[in-house]
């Protein structure tokens, strides 16, 4: 009887471990993103889409710029236009920063008006041309 109980308990423990945690879907998706040099400035432009089922307000796009070997160098923020994004809506961002000559690629992050980090799909890295 004890042996059966031990086998039953071990089986239940093993069955409980098979469940894998399902990752949450992204809140936003990068539709387009580009960076181009112009004189002493790098201009970042792009479009993002709200992929969450909820509206997003006062979203900030964070541009993380990297030197070779993915070495972090600079982070800048830009507000989306418009401020309110219904599910499925798209918004543009535009940002400029001084060109140090070392930056080669960038990635995007986002946060809402309450400084909550948003999950972003297709966020890079993108080349700086």
Segments and roles (model prediction):
Residues 26-27, 58, 68-79:
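Short beta-strand and strand-turn-strand segments in soluble, beta-rich domains
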Residues 7-17:
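Hydrophobic h-region of N-terminal signal peptides that target proteins for export
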Residues 1-6:
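Bacterial N-terminal signal peptides that target proteins for export
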Residues 17-47, 123-129:
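Low-complexity, acidic Ser/Thr/Pro/Gly-rich terminal tails and inter-domain linkers that flank the onset
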Residues 94-129:
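Terminal connector regions
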Residues 48-52:
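Asparagine-centered strand-capping/turn motif at beta-strand->loop junctions
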Residues 53-71, 110-112:
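Short acidic, flexible loop segments centered on an aromatic residue
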Residues 73-102:
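Intrinsically disordered, low-complexity Pro/Gly/Ser/Thr-rich segments with frequent PxxP/GP/PP motifs
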């Amino acid at each position: 009887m004890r042996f059966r109980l031990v086998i039953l308990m071990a089986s239940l423990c093993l069955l409980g471990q098979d469940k894998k945690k399902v990752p949450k879907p992204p809140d936003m998706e990068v539709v387009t993103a580009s960076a181009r040099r112009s004189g002493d400035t790098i201009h970042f432009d792009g479009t993002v889409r709200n992929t969450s089922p909820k509206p997003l307000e006062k979203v900030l796009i964070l541009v993380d710029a990297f030197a070779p070997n993915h070495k972090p160098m600079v982070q800048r923020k830009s507000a989306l236009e418009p401020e309110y994004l219904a599910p499925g809506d798209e918004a543009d961002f535009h940002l400029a920063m001084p060109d140090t000559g070392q930056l080669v690629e960038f990635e995007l992050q986002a946060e809402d008006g309450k400084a909550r980090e948003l999950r972003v799909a297709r966020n890079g890295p993108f080349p700086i041309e």
